[in-house]
């Protein structure tokens, strides 16, 4: 059985307009160029997949326009209406640093629709697993506002669609984007039918978001696990976090399907983080998730593209993920790894271990909720 793959030229042409890094053009001393959230890194990932002839090992899942009722499962009507109106004009800002150009609503709806289609095919066993190379990203978006380049919360919408249609009671979302998925956390914070686990650089973005003490409220207590890593963490920290926290959480929860908010911005050369991951880090995390999924939910894993801003490194990080998903016999080496490893991150330091261990409290609450 083949892995599924969603991508479309229209998604890769999603535009955020001119900018200067993450900054809007409000200072006339900053010379404008591309906004940091442009499509180039994702286009280069797609180009690498084509160059290596991996598309033949993937089942292409076509995008479709998400129905407004699907988006309404998560987002408020007035907010959707504003985005649609601005998109039909000349674009605007969805909120908290989320600029977009004309036709953004149409493009975002295509990405959401494609992810929903992919998720359903994975759940029904029509494809082995799935990767959605979609834009714009989603995990920061809240119910009534955009946030951090994200207009709509793609994974939250897809997960909620599956839950409603197939009466699911245990959906896991693993978020390894280097920035905390504040939107996804808030949406599911009071619920136990979705387990949200985020591993992120401490206090990178958003500010003061993603504390290990934020482990959910009411029915959701123990179903929100934030794993913080300090700046300078790398491969060793992520291995430790996965082995000690993520594996135990998934084994206790026994999800019916696993979504991954698949950001590549923990790369050692990403401009929006200070972590030291490389392609083998993403390979390890993918392999771990796939192995657990085989044991817990018949291999049902859906990866959805989030951040990643290094035009050089994102393609190789994404390639490592796809190679594991399709079980490709060849493993292409990461040409950037040596440069990253030279800076550190391969040894777990005591301060890194101590910070990760703060997440055991949330894990233990989850385990106490699932003593079968």
How would you describe each model-predicted region?
Residues 1-70:
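N-terminal low-complexity, Ser/Thr- and acidic-residue-enriched intrinsically disordered segments
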Residues 33-36, 58, 62, 74, ...:
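Short coil/turn segments at secondary-structure boundaries
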Residues 63-88:
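Charged, often glycine-rich, active-site loop that binds/positions anionic groups
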């Amino acid at each position: 059985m083949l892995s599924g793959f969603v991508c479309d030229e229209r998604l890769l042409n999603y535009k955020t307009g001119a900018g200067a890094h993450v900054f809007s053009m409000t200072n006339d001393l900053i010379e404008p160029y591309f906004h940091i959230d442009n499509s180039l890194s994702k286009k280069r990932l797609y180009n690498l997949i084509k160059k290596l002839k991996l598309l033949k090992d993937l089942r292409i899942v076509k995008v479709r326009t998400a129905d407004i009722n699907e988006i309404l499962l998560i987002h408020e009507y007035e907010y959707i209406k504003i985005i649609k109106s601005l998109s039909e004009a000349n674009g605007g800002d969805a909120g908290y640093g989320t600029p977009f150009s004309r036709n953004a609503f149409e493009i975002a709806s295509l990405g959401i629709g494609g992810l929903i289609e992919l998720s359903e095919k994975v759940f029904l066993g029509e494809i082995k697993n799935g990767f959605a190379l979609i834009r714009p990203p989603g995990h920061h978006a809240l119910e009534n506002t955009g946030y951090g380049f994200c207009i709509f919360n793609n994974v939250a919408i897809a997960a909620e669609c599956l839950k409603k249609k197939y009466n699911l009671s245990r959906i896991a979302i693993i978020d390894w984007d280097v920035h905390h998925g504040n939107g996804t956390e808030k949406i599911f914070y009071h619920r136990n039918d979705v387990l949200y686990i985020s591993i992120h650089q401490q206090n990178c973005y958003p500010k003061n978001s993603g504390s290990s003490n934020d482990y959910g409220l009411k029915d959701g207590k123990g179903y929100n696990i934030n794993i913080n890593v300090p700046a300078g963490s790398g491969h060793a920290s992520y291995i430790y976090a996965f082995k000690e926290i993520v594996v135990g959480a998934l084994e206790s929860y026994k999800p019916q399907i696993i979504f991954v908010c698949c950001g590549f911005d923990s790369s050692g050369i990403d401009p929006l983080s200070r972590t030291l991951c490389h392609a083998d880090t993403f390979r390890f995390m993918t392999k771990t998730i796939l192995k657990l999924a085989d044991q817990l939910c018949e291999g049902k894993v859906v990866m959805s593209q989030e951040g990643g801003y290094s035009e050089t490194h994102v393609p190789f990080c994404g390639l490592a993920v796809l190679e594991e998903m399709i079980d490709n016999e060849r493993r292409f080496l990461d040409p950037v790894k040596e440069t990253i490893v030279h800076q550190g991150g391969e040894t777990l330091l005591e301060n890194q271990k101590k910070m990760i261990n703060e997440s055991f409290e949330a894990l233990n609450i989850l385990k106490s909720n699932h003593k079968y």
